[in-house]
Amino acid sequence: MTAIRYEFIKTCKQTGARLGRVHTPHGSFDTPTFMPVGTLATVKTMSPEELKAMDSGIILSNTYHLWLRPGHEIVREAGGLHKFMNWDRAILTDSGGFQVFSLSDFRRIEEEGVHFRNHLNGDKLFLSPEKAMEIQNALGSDIMMAFDECPPFPATFEYMKKSVERTSRWAERCLKAHERPQDQGLFGIVQGGEFEELRRQSAKDLVSMDFPGYAIGGLSVGEPKDIMNRVLEFTTPLLPDDKPRYLMGVGSPDSLIDGAIRGVDMFDCVLPTRIARNGTCMTSEGRLVVKNAKFARDFGPLDPNCDCYTCKNYSRAYIRHLMKCDETFGIRLTSYHNLHFLLNLMEQVRQAIREDRLGDFREEFFEQYGFNKPNAKNF
């Protein structure tokens, strides 16, 4: 019996998107879903109760950051991440690989792992597949990720080929080092950049190892959206139908819908809380920057079509005032709204799949949001 089980419910006849449910040791969640990111064992400014109120069934935490602060041994002593942060629903932890490759100025990759510098104090550190498993086993997440190499975009075919081969060898080492397969599901990560041949090789290698789920990595790293969609189109069919598929680091509304249409079940991104901190809000009518002067006397909600706590209780003028005065409550209100917006969007996506009309929903949403305009603004 594995810790993670995927239950397939139906396919959208119009698009091929999947409706499903993922079962974990800490409850189940419906898919496609968006996972709020709690990098340091907290979704910035949000309480667990607030996340539950917006119906979040799973959140993400970060292995690299929790290894550095407070240290995985302290989290283990606390009884694991769920107890430490008072969250009784599912948690996914990433492997730390992305942070090693994106945050550290110095890094040296070798077969054993990666030498790099701590981005906080410059200390030399070493992270290997075995260490990534040790940390995640101590954290006790429901879903943990294999340690992979995260090449930048663009990368040459030759470099990417070596990287994919190394990632496959590291994935095998992760499986061997994983000490808690009965209560923690380990996902493999398909790499290969924009190269179909390498994505095929990576998927073939990882599927042969029979992971309980699969992530599609190396996207949302600077490539244009049409390349991301093309890669998804040839990658998701390579993955088993009876396992969850997770697209890492994607959180803009258009990409969530386009990813679901291409067979993705799970998404995560810091985007909704990061942009909330500078007053940028996702609304049913497009991007809204609440700090703008034109909202100083606007006493309507951030989004007239939203029923979240923020929109039911506070005006654009009030939230603008809080943001201009650097009041933390303003960030809480915009963060709550953006997270609610994406979680609610995914519920709308699931409903559209149930009704076999996700293609129509995409057209309506893109038209209303303004994604169809030639100068459409993203986040």
UniProtKB/Swiss-Prot annotation:
* Entry note: cofactor: Binds 1 zinc ion per subunit.
SUPFAM superfamilies recorded for this chain? tRNA-guanine transglycosylase
According to its UniProt record, what is one Pfam family this protein matches? TGT
Cofactor(s) the record lists: Zn(2+)
The UniProt entry annotates the active site at 94 (proton acceptor), 268 (nucleophile)
Question: Where Zn(2+) is bound, by residue?
Answer: 306, 308, 311, 337
Superkingdom of the organism of origin: Bacteria
InterPro entries for the chain: ArchSynthase1/Queuine_TRR, TGT, TGT-like_sf, tRNA_ribo_trans-like
* Functional pathway: tRNA modification; tRNA-queuosine biosynthesis
The signal peptide, as residue positions, is none
Q: What is this protein called?
A: Queuine tRNA-ribosyltransferase
Give the species this sequence originates from: Bacillus mycoides (strain KBAB4) (Bacillus weihenstephanensis)
> Top-down, what is the taxonomic lineage of the species of origin?
Bacteria, Bacillati, Bacillota, Bacilli, Bacillales
